[in-house]
């Protein structure tokens, strides 16, 4: 049986980390792509040389020609410009939209059957544009945001309660930005909803709100500390979890920026929602019931994403 092929489009910090994690899990052979020739080849060689030490068998190669991604089963897109301190994800829109146009054309030509995971920011608008530029089926193009945002929420909760991260489930809806909606009612510690833990006196409603706000600011906190770029270990781990669920048909329930066509009252937009990811790509969007407050927060988030999509159309009218 031939090994699966994973194409990593963009070989910066996330791209290199993705290549290492995919190798360690032996998900398939890996092609690192970047327009900066030499970087993907160098990183590929470096990671391949860790194989004898770490005991994995995976072929790694680097390229600066899209022909190298031909026939890829999975494409993970990180190409584009990362945030610097003081920038919002939305500030990257104009530059990264042009990158998505080139990436979309490359995937359309060489890997039209791939499952595509987009990480480039501003995430929800970029994955929407990438799907349109590539023409791939909507269930095969998805954005990585919810797994990462939920992981941040889970970590902060685990630290607050001094419990294992494995016993914390967390739920984040909406766009990957300042308007994301971490849902306390659907997030649990040992199966007990956070709203019940507040009633039990484990934490105050004010403290919970602080943790929710830190989750929203999770990426900016790291950007502020690094000063020269943005997060890469946790984003890469999050995308690998999604890719693995697709490649192994695990049917994991994972939050992702998925294409909505009527669900949650949203049409032709990518927004973070709970999904089932299996061999068919996004096999199902799970619609949960929202109360008035949650619905209002979700619609505010949807509005922010819609504004970004409109800005994309102004730059590239072909997206209409």
Swiss-Prot record:
Catalytic EC class: oxidoreductase
Reaction(s) catalysed by this chain's protein: (S)-malate + NAD(+) = oxaloacetate + NADH + H(+)
Enzyme Commission code: 1.1.1.37
Lineage top rank: taxon: Bacteria
GO molecular function terms attached to this record: L-lactate dehydrogenase activity; L-malate dehydrogenase (NAD+) activity
Catalytic residue positions: 176
Keywords in alphabetical order: NAD, Oxidoreductase, Tricarboxylic acid cycle
Biological process, per Gene Ontology: lactate metabolic process; tricarboxylic acid cycle
Residue positions binding NAD(+): 10-15, 34, 96, 119-121
Keyword hit for Protein biosynthesis: no
Gene3D superfamilies: Lactate dehydrogenase/glycoside hydrolase, family 4, C-terminal, NAD(P)-binding Rossmann-like Domain
TM region(s), chain numbering: none
Pfam family, one: Ldh_1_C
Residues annotated for substrate binding in this entry: 83, 89, 121, 152
UniProt xrefs under HAMAP family: Malate_dehydrog_3
Homology family: Belongs to the LDH/MDH superfamily. MDH type 3 family.
NCBIfam families, per the entry: MalateDH_bact, PRK06223.1
Function: Catalyzes the reversible oxidation of malate to oxaloacetate.
Protein name per UniProt: Malate dehydrogenase
Organism: Agrobacterium fabrum (strain C58 / ATCC 33970) (Agrobacterium tumefaciens (strain C58))
Taxonomic lineage: Bacteria, Pseudomonadati, Pseudomonadota, Alphaproteobacteria, Hyphomicrobiales
Gene: mdh
